[in-house]
């Protein structure tokens, strides 16, 4: 056996062997059900970063453990390959985005292979390939047939740089595009939507079933769905009793305190309600607001601006006339596009009232309410009604119900549940996306492409400018087609789908990747779904994860699958952070190579002190670490061990080169340990243990089964990979502290066999190499997970700490079952007591059974 651990010599060799032996090919589950481990598939940028490494290695460990436990494991990989980055890169380089993407996929696949991931590449999918997006189009038509896909004119978020429409979720809190960073504008366009709001209640209620998801993610989804209970209230226009404005409120108990009704600037009633003398100012305000994004308009920090329309409505509870305003903070597609302003009991309404001198009427009384309102604040807590006529004296909860019921009897109110969730906008005016399989006919309207004509294939080799709407509009040979219904000239839909459409069902295709008749069979989905362990970033909590849940529920209702939730357990791994050097006065980052003294770093240009931070790795911050460089220097197993050991999976990980070196040294220790035992072991076949066991054998055997128990526990429910590796270190220490020469052959075999099998999911190449060095005939990854022997955990004796006046002075071995009196007697009779007490009896003895005895002179 080579005395030197050389990862470069063995890792590629074993990867080749595993591929040739089909080690990672997915077997059909013998019991009808397998274990599905899945990482969120990546966009193929062409370059693997450490965030990728962490995600995929975590999933790989879980997959390998489940295989060793005897499960049929599905562990696939694919590529979320459509989208703006590829199209923009193609425009910049004047290349075809398909060719660009395919090259990147090849490059990233080879990088993933170097990590030793146990991926079944036979199931690989790329969303940009027509044999995949054919089925994305097929599923779109299923949703269309079910009334879940529809087209309407809508105010949309327009990215002026990428020149495409963005979903609300793709606009950040500053009103900027999540991709380009441009300030988002508002435009009216005819767009395709998916009716996700039809599933709002199910999406919210079924979060309670997802006990294997982080509470944080479930809370984020619940808040995004945003269930509100209240009432819709009709306010009659004073000058036209046949016209009413419908307002939704969660606080019907404050209705008597309304001082105005506020409409969205683009509410359909604004033009008819506006008085002639207010038309100019209203139209100017409408034009100004149209340039703002929804987030800019609704930000808590933004001023609340509006104009009076000249109209009034009647409060149905007390008949009081209320002015009708329009304001920037009211959105036409949220609720009813109208709100009632109650300045005394809503902080936003209070700010608006203060700006425009509107009345403030308190109608909720509680301790401190009057003082808060007098001080210019709104009292938003419940209380007892005042100034509310017949409802005075009721508490808020009862008043909500009574006022709503009264309004229902009078015909001006109805109890209502609403949701913050909006329908999913999927139209994109770009080229590199899945074509929407619809043909627009002047006579027949929107006609679905017949399923036998799918896929609608993207034309290749076209000129991309990146500007001016969809490039597909310019492809006349592609656009102009006969109507499938009447045969008359018609045009294809030139919008492409949001890339989240492709990623909302890919986990289903992996279950049946070669099916040419349908996207997946019900039988295949039932064998593998739901995904038992899904791993990905917290940034996908609202977008991808919510859309995937919607897709799954919709497809179940269409009769295509039987599962209602796609992912049983979810692990959201933390970010990988690197050291950054930042000049606080300029905000600029300095590359580590330009920092002469990392202990007291200074700006090489100005000499100013730099602040040292740990931040998410990125090129702009000069703190990225190339996985290939780490593998070249230390090997894939060391990279894996570091990324798993440095922090719990869900926490952020701070990169530290010295800790990488530490993991390499640990693997070297295991190499040397096996090397020292190599001459004593020619096979790993178990041998009969001598009885009774020698003390050294018993001690090591107990350490073996403590490790099996602890590592198995760490990999069971709460995935704690870092503490599992700590247990491997403890077992290694237990073996080396005794020494292989002091162990019987049977216990030595058991120790090394167990160590290598526990190590195999974490450092698969090293474990495989050492397994074969010790005589293993098949792969360690097929050797089975070690079985716990509870009897080995039973101790005849334990180490008892002896303290003198609170200071540890040594340990003695005592019977594990000794009681307090026996422990005190053994401690007093020990050499430690004789030395430190010098023949004097202690004034006090403190006994902690099984742990320590403290003798106080």
From Swiss-Prot:
Family from the record: Belongs to the class-I aminoacyl-tRNA synthetase family.
Residue ranges of the motif 'KMSKS' region: 616-620
UniProt keyword Signal present: no
MF (Gene Ontology): aminoacyl-tRNA deacylase activity; ATP binding; leucine-tRNA ligase activity
Signal peptide start and end residues: none
CC terms in the record's Gene Ontology section: cytosol
Chain positions recorded as ATP binding sites: 619
Gene3D superfamilies in alphabetical order: HUPs, Isoleucyl-tRNA Synthetase, Domain 1
Catalytic activity: tRNA(Leu) + L-leucine + ATP = L-leucyl-tRNA(Leu) + AMP + diphosphate
Protein name: Leucine--tRNA ligase
Gene label: leuS
Main localization (coarse): cytoplasm
Domain of life of the source: Bacteria
């Amino acid at each position: 056996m080579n005395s030197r651990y050389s990862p470069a010599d063995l890792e590629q060799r074993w990867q080749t062997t595993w591929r040739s032996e089909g080690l990672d090919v997915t077997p059909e589950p013998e019991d009808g059900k397998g274990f599905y481990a899945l990482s969120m598939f990546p966009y193929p940028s062409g370059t693997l970063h450490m965030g990728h490494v962490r995600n995929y290695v975590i999933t790989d460990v879980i997959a390998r453990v489940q295989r060793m436990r005897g499960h049929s494991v599905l562990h696939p990989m694919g590529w979320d390959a459509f989208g703006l980055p590829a199209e923009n890169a193609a425009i910049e380089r004047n290349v075809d985005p398909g060719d660009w993407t395919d090259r990147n996929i090849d490059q990233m696949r080879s990088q993933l292979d170097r990590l030793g991931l146990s991926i079944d590449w036979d199931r690989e999918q790329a969303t940009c390939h027509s044999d995949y997006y054919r089925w994305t189009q097929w599923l779109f038509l299923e949703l269309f047939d079910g009334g879940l896909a529809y087209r309407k004119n809508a105010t949309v978020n327009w990215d002026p740089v990428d020149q495409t429409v963005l979903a609300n979720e793709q606009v950040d809190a500053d009103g900027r595009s999540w991709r380009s960073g441009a300030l988002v504008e508002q435009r009216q366009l005819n767009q395709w939507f998916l009716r996700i709001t039809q599933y709002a209640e199910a999406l919210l209620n079924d979060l309670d079933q997802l006990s294997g998801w982080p509470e944080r993610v479930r809370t984020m989804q619940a808040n995004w769905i945003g269930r509100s209970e209240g009432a819709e209230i009709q306010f009659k226009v004073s000058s036209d009793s046949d016209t009413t404005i419908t307002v939704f409120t969660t606080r019907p108990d404050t209705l008597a305190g309304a001082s105005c009704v506020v409409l969205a600037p683009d509410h359909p009633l604004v033009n008819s309600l506006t008085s002639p003398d207010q038309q100019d100012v209203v139209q100017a305000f409408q034009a100004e607001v149209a340039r703002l994004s929804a987030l800019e308009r609704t930000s808590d920090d933004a001023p609340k601006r509006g104009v009076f329309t000249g109209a009034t409505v009647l409060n149905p509870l007390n008949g009081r006339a209320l002015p009708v305003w329009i304001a920037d903070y009211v959105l036409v597609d949220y609720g009813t596009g109208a709100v009632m302003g109650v300045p005394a009991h809503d902080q936003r309404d209070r700010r608006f009232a203060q700006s425009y001198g509107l009345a403030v009427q308190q109608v909720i009384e509680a301790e401190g309410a009057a003082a808060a309102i007098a001080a210019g604040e709104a009292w938003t807590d419940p209380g007892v009604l005042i100034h509310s006529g017949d409802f005075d004296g009721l508490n808020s909860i009862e008043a909500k119900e009574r006022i709503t019921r009264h309004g229902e009897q009078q015909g001006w109110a109805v109890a209502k549940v609403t949701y913050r969730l909006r329908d999913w906008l999927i139209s994109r005016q770009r080229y590199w996306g899945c074509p929407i399989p619809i043909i627009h006919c002047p006579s027949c309207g929107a006609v679905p492409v017949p399923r036998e004509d799918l896929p609608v294939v993207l034309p290749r080799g076209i000129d991309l400018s990146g500007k001016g709407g969809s490039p597909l509009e310019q492809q006349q040979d592609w656009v102009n087609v006969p109507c499938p219904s009447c045969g008359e000239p018609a045009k294809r839909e030139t919008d492409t789908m949001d890339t989240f459409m492709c990623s909302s069902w890919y986990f289903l295709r992996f279950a049946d990747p070669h099916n040419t008749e349908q996207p997946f069979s019900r039988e295949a989905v039932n064998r593998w779904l739901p995904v038992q362990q899904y791993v990905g970033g917290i940034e996908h909590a609202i977008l991808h994860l919510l859309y995937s849940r919607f897709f799954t529920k919709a497809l179940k209702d269409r009769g295509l699958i039987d599962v209602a939730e796609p992912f049983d357990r979810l692990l959201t791994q933390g970010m990988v952070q690197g050291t950054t050097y930042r000049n606080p006065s300029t905000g600029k980052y300095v590359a580590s190579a330009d920092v002469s003294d990392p202990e007291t770093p200074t700006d090489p240009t100005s000499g100013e002190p730099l602040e040292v931070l740990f931040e998410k790795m990125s090129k702009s911050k000069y703190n990225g670490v190339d996985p290939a460089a780490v593998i070249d220097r230390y090997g894939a197993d060391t990279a894996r061990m570091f990324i798993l050991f440095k922090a719990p999976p869900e926490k952020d990980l701070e990169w530290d080169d010295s800790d990488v070196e530490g993991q390499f040294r640990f693997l070297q220790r295991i190499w040397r340990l096996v090397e020292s035992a190599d001459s004593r072991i020619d096979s790993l076949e178990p041998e009969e243990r001598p009885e009774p066991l020698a003390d050294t054998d018993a001690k090591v055997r107990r350490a073996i089964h403590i490790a099996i128990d602890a590592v198995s526990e760490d990999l069971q429910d709460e995935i704690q990979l870092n503490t599992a590796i700590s247990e491997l270190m403890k077992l290694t220490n237990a073996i080396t502290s005794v020494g292989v020469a002091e162990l019987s052959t049977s216990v030595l075999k058991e120790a090394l066999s167990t160590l290598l099998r526990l190590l195999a999911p974490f450092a698969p190449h090293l474990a495989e190499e050492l397994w074969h060095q010790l005589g293993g005939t098949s792969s360690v990854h097929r050797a089975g997970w070690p079985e716990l022997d509870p009897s080995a955990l039973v101790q005849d004796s334990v180490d008892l700490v002896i303290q003198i006046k609170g200071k540890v002075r040594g340990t003695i071995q005592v019977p594990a079952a000794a009681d307090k009196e026996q422990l005190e007697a053994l401690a007093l009779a020990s050499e430690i007591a004789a030395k430190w007490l010098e023949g004097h009896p202690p004034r006090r003895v403190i006994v902690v059974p099984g742990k320590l005895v403290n003798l106080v002179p």
